[in-house]
């Protein structure tokens, strides 16, 4: 809805030419397909065709890995095309409409089972605002009200207090009161070879102050779960591999593993799911400050207004706002309850080596079937498609990696990343990168962060050679001193390139570990393999 200028100025520090220009781009969209210099002059289809000639050799020994590669090849394509606002309104509507589907409460036994898993967590207390801000990424946008770099407005933001008052979000920042709103953002995801295939993702850019108050809980929570190994994906991909291996080694030989697939999990994260997330957090927290936080801060991510154009704001309760500091944690905790409930409804117990992260999950229990899992999950208003659930006794896909009970490295069922997906990421950009900032070192670091994912692929060495041929610097081999000083180069890159490590790896370096996020890059497989080719 349109709001009056005097109302708009309660949400944003006006004048703000950067914000006005931003919304102008949101309205018009972005039609360009941004390519990298990788295999310059060749189409992405031609690059994939050339690599496929080598890739097909895995089909005989690992047919399900070949199927995994073939499936992801269909989705390889542009990522940078943003539709105009008018063509994205239905995606925004979905956040408000999808939470109203029929839903029943969760089984209390399933909630208790999840709580029992986490009983080793000491009663958590809130972090101070100062300590929370110290380990937050401050190179990103601050959102409402200043809409500038976070690092430029820290002193204007803390101390802060935030809470919902009816349909409004109140933000008190360093003695000044504002109304809070998320700003409509965008993320593109490959969906196929044509520009029209780009999947349009709604991003909720949360106010800096709201994120600070949220992360006072979620930072220590994730850190504690990391220390106890409760969510392997928050620890490392190696921890994920170990748990997948245990799952295959402990499940019944006739029992399948179900890899679950939700449609629009954020949008369908309804009041039933939200209340369970709150109950689970209440069980992990202690003290009056935590009680106040649960009443004042926790609900914001499900009710914060959305500024989607200059002078236009949408109000009302909705699904999960993606830019919240608690998006991944709330969804992961609730997803674990869903997994327990599926097993309990079948009168059995979940294999404890089942896993989930956000909407991504893999589970097994005696007598499991995809139909039973889907029926159990859908009771709570969540949307699933039976044809998209992957079922197998021997292999699974989790966090975009293929695992097989017989494909092991040092005894571990390691996760294999698709080389086809990697090619798409190497050739296509998510957004425009300023060439004055993105020199050849930054481009090469981005390439290496993508190629490192394939370190367990049976054709990893052949793939690396293929990639070297497609890059004018030969992946840094042609840049004097680059590989020898790669740790220093990576540290410089992280603030400039927020997704340099990838989303999952960023979660693994959350909290106190973020400052060491580049540590160990010199030991990456791809770096060592390149050095051996000098």
From Swiss-Prot:
Annotated localization: Virion
The Gene Ontology terms for molecular function here are: nucleotide binding; RNA binding; RNA-directed RNA polymerase activity
A GO cellular component annotation here is: virion component
EC number(s) given by UniProt: 2.7.7.48
RdRp catalytic domain location is 255-373
Database matches in InterPro entries: DNA/RNA_pol_sf (IPR043502), RNA-dir_pol_C (IPR001205)
Superkingdom of this entry's organism? Viruses
UniProt xrefs under CDD domains: dsRNAv_Picobirnaviridae_RdRp
Q: Name one Pfam family in it.
A: RdRP_1
Describe the reaction catalysed, as an equation: RNA(n) + a ribonucleoside 5'-triphosphate = RNA(n+1) + diphosphate
Q: What does this protein do?
A: RNA-directed RNA polymerase that is involved in both transcription and genome replication.
Q: What is this protein called?
A: Potential RNA-dependent RNA polymerase
């Amino acid at each position: 809805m349109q709001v009056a200028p005097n109302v708009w100025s309660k949400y944003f520090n006006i004048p703000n030419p950067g914000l006005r220009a931003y919304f102008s781009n949101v309205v018009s969209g972005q039609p360009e397909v941004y390519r990298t210099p990788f295999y310059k002059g060749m189409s992405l289809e031609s690059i994939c065709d050339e690599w496929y000639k080598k890739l097909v050799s895995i089909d005989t020994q690992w047919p399900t890995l070949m199927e995994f590669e073939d499936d992801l090849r269909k989705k390889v394509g542009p990522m940078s095309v943003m539709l105009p606002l008018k063509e994205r309104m239905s995606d925004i509507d979905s956040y408000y409409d999808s939470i109203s589907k029929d839903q029943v409460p969760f089984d209390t036994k399933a909630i208790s089972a999840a709580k029992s898993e986490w009983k080793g967590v000491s009663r958590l207390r809130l972090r101070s605002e100062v300590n929370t801000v110290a380990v937050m990424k401050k190179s990103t946008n601050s959102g409402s009200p200043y809409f500038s770099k976070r690092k430029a407005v820290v002193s204007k933001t803390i101390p802060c207090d935030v809470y919902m008052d009816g349909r409004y979000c109140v933000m008190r920042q360093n003695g000044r009161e504002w109304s809070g709103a998320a700003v409509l953002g965008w993320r593109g995801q490959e969906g196929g070879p044509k520009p029209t295939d780009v999947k349009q993702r709604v991003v909720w850019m949360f106010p800096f102050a709201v994120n600070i108050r949220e992360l006072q809980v979620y930072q220590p929570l994730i850190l504690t779960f990391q220390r106890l190994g409760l969510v392997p994906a928050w620890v490392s991909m190696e921890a994920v591999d170990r748990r997948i291996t245990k799952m295959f080694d402990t499940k019944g030989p006739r029992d399948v593993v179900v890899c679950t697939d939700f449609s629009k999990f954020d949008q369908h994260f309804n009041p039933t799911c939200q209340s369970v997330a709150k109950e689970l957090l209440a069980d992990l927290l202690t003290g009056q400050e935590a009680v106040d936080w649960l009443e004042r801060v926790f609900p914001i991510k499900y009710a914060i207004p959305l500024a989607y154009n200059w002078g236009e704001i949408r109000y009302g309760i909705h699904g999960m706002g993606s830019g919240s500091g608690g998006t991944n944690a709330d969804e992961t905790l609730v997803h674990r309850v869903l997994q327990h409930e599926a097993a309990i409804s079948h009168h059995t117990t979940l294999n404890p080596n089942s896993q989930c992260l956000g909407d991504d999950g893999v589970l097994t229990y005696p007598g499991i079937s995809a139909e039973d899992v889907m029926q159990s999950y859908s009771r709570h208003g969540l949307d699933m498609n039976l044809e998209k659930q992957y079922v197998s006794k021997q292999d699974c896909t989790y966090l975009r990696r293929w695992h097989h009970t017989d494909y092991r490295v040092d005894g571990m069922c390691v996760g294999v990343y698709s080389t086809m997906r990697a090619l798409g990421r190497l050739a296509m950009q998510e957004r425009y990168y300023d060439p004055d900032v993105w020199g050849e070192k930054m481009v090469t670091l981005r390439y290496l962060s993508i190629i490192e994912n394939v370190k367990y692929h049976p054709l990893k060495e052949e793939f690396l050679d293929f990639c070297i041929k497609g890059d004018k610097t030969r992946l840094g081999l042609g840049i004097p001193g680059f590989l020898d000083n790669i740790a220093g180069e990576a540290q410089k890159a992280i603030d400039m390139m927020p997704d340099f490590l990838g989303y999952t790896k960023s979660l693994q370096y959350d909290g106190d570990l973020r400052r060491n996020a580049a540590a160990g890059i010199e030991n990456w497989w791809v770096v060592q393999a390149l050095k051996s080719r000098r």
